[in-house]
Amino acid sequence: MVTVDEVRKAQRAEGPATILAIGTATPPNCVDQSTYPDYYFRITKSEHKTELKEKFQRMCDKSMIKKRYMYLTEEILKENPSMCEYMAPSLDARQDMVVVEIPKLGKEAATKAIKEWGQPKSKITHLVFCTTSGVDMPGADYQLTKLLGLRPSVKRLMMYQQGCFAGGTVLRLAKDLAENNKGARVLVVCSEITAVTFRGPSDTHLDSLVGQALFGDGAAAIIVGSDPLPDIERPLFELVSAAQTILPDSDGAIDGHLREVGLTFHLLKDVPGLISKNIEKSLNEAFKPLDITDWNSLFWIAHPGGPAILDQVEAKLGLKPEKLEATRNILSEYGNMSSACVLFILDEVRRKSVANGHKTTGEGLEWGVLFGFGPGLTVETVVLHSVAAST
């Protein structure tokens, strides 16, 4: 007779969860940040608000973003004028777009990840899908399963409306799934489209304008599994530990509310200050078991909420400028893509590591940290271990 203990041991993987492939995708429509204020105030019929436009221009200039990708084109917005007002009922129009486009963009990223992984998609056992928008039943996880032609028995988990920290959350979940299910191969997809948050400007709600200056669209996918098959699967990063915490005194710092007008975005407190004040505590808790206290000895993947967050974290921890280079580069080239950002940065770090001839996937370093920041104020901290870089 087999015991429960024996069954449990047989179910568990031996090694740590490992990222085996990464894929990314964006909509084709690319928006230049320097000319975006002109376009935004024209399309929302707000050109008479000259002072507000000047404020928005300054926001865009200070954003450190060069360009963003957006599903919403001028043609789509002209067909849906209610989306261009500040608070017009428009949820139906927005939902009709995102319930179709979010799985579609996710499929593009997932297809790239599966191709890099090199294994048949029938070997995918679990699917974790994350998006801040497009709540529907059956969800984007179901739609993606159909679009990709995954097995109907794939075990799905759908995460809606978590916000910008969720790129860390999906790694935490994928780690637990891979390590507790021997042979599991988890497809993780973060797909974000700003069609639910786009709206016209308001003199009295500048926090909404901050969102209009920062957010972009993108999807990223990874394959996670333990005990990679030698000579068949190519490990990129090992997921060593994962933690989540709510920062003290941060209630209402970042809020998003789904209403008839779409998803409203509220920035109420000093978010960069709250994060920089508390980040060392998260680092100490994560790296104490490894006896690491030199934050410059790590490679960094931080959610780029905005330049002020990165500047204050850098200053508080005394980080060398190159530590957040990959993070700043993704912010510059894509804007803030919410949950997908950290996976884009992971992709950038491993590619640059190979291109620059580093010995490991983590810029030549052994250990790294991945941070997600978002509503709550919630912080996700993931400890990464790099592997030998292969060309």
UniProtKB/Swiss-Prot annotation:
Expressed in fruits. Keywords: Acyltransferase, Transferase. It catalyses: (E)-4-coumaroyl-CoA + 3 malonyl-CoA + 3 H(+) = 2',4,4',6'-tetrahydroxychalcone + 3 CO2 + 4 CoA. PROSITE patterns: CHALCONE_SYNTH. Belongs to the thiolase-like superfamily. Chalcone/stilbene synthases family. Gene3D superfamilies: 3.40.47.10. Its EC number is 2.3.1.74. Homodimer. This is Polyketide synthase 1. GO terms for molecular function: naringenin-chalcone synthase activity; protein homodimerization activity. Pathway: Secondary metabolite biosynthesis; flavonoid biosynthesis. One of its GO terms (biological process) is polyketide biosynthetic process. Pfam families: Chal_sti_synt_C, Chal_sti_synt_N. It comes from Rubus idaeus (Raspberry). It comes from the Eukaryota. The active site is at residue 164. InterPro entries: Chalcone/stilbene_synt_C (IPR012328), Chalcone/stilbene_synt_N (IPR001099), Chalcone/stilbene_synthase_AS (IPR018088), Polyketide_synthase_type-III (IPR011141), Thiolase-like (IPR016039). The keyword Transferase applies.
